[in-house]
Amino acid sequence: VLLAEDNAANQHLARRLLEKRGHAVTVVANGREAIDAVRCRRFDVVLMDVQMPEVDGYEATAAIRAGETPGGRRLPIIALTAHAISGDRQRCLQAGMDDYLSKPIRKEDLYDMIERWGAAPADPQTDHGPDPQTHATEPGDALQLAAVDLARLKGLAGDDPDLIGEVAEIFLAESEDLMQAIRDSLAEGDAETLSKAAHSLKGSVANFGAEQAFEAARSVEMASRHNELDGLDAVVQTLAEQVDTVRHDLERLLMAKEFSE
């Protein structure tokens, strides 16, 4: 499986879920790298994020299709998108993609999609779900979390405490840099960089079901995409406060028993 995704947390989550299922995974961070990877080796399926730097998923798909031999094998390409917008699926299909998977990605949806398109796992029984003893205690459930939806996070990660912890740690490591990029690009009037940073942050907080942080990030992304930066300072401040709340929730989760060895 070729995974083309620029968000570090989403990369890690999808790769680990696929590897648990028995799939070999190659990860690239933009469309140009995806095109090069397909030219160099054969893949069963491509998972293609539609919004990536340098070359986006639509452009990469068009280039891959242009390189295919007429009448020859058609490489299945599955779009990954955070856009829950009517007509988005049709745009993906028109671009030459074969199917569509909405982010944040759920384990069952991911497995069903790639195996429907021909990427058979090395061992279909590899992922049996969590060991029953992991449900003996649920200290994470006892925590009163202000922003993070633990049930959604467990659903995304297949109820795997290790994977939940890894995704949380990635967010804690990258979210401060993303917020700083958002502040700096707003101060400099750099709408393009602002939009990209807000988009990346939006994709990360979606994994945790942090709706207020997600909406704030989406507002910043949409405004900057249309170069409407006036009045964004207050929205960015709200976003920073919501991200801090998510970070606090995740730090508490990492300290809870079910996320420790």
What are these regions (language model features)?
Residues 99, 106-261:
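Two-component system phosphorelay core
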